[in-house]
Amino acid sequence: MLIPRRVKHRKQHHPSRSGAAKGGTQVTFGDYGIQALEPAYITNRQIESARIAMTRHIKRGGKIWINIFPDRPLTKKPAETRMGSGKGSPEWWIANVKPGRVMFEMSYPNEEIAREALRRAMHKLPCKCRIVTREEQF
């Protein structure tokens, strides 16, 4: 799982979900990518699940890049706890994804297999996405 090694502060404010992505909106490393169409908090488990779905489908011969990292903690209070008495303990690590962000990239010789692998990974993510290619964006 992806989590930071060290953090300066254990608890943070919730990140803003409004606005579009400022950077990372184009396929730079691979030939195909998954681009977010709506804002979402993506947990480290969802990233890992999408990565496994892609690698199991392509087996060998391709390369995958993960362009997001879950660096923000989300806190949660225990069940059946009364209001007050401070902020809850960190429960998940999330990556704040905004519309337009390319989250995963892949290079693979066969386009059909690459698109199917990305489609399977998209089903593991909590936001609407689309498959983009390097040729489409220019």
From Swiss-Prot:
BP GO terms, sorted: translation
GO molecular function: rRNA binding; structural constituent of ribosome; tRNA binding
InterPro entries hit by this protein: Ribosomal_uL16, Ribosomal_uL16_bact-type, Ribosomal_uL16_CS, Ribosomal_uL16_dom, Ribosomal_uL16_sf
Keywords: Ribonucleoprotein, Ribosomal protein, RNA-binding, rRNA-binding, tRNA-binding
GO cellular component entries: cytosolic large ribosomal subunit
Sequence ranges of Basic residues compositional bias: 1-16
Cysteine disulfide partners in this protein: none
Keyword Protein transport attached: no
Sequence segments annotated as region (Disordered): 1-25
Stated role: Binds 23S rRNA and is also seen to make contacts with the A and possibly P site tRNAs.
Family stated for the protein in its record: Belongs to the universal ribosomal protein uL16 family.
NCBIfam families tied to this protein: rplP_bact
Quaternary structure note: Part of the 50S ribosomal subunit.
Name this protein carries in UniProt: Large ribosomal subunit protein uL16
Organism: Rhodococcus opacus (strain B4)
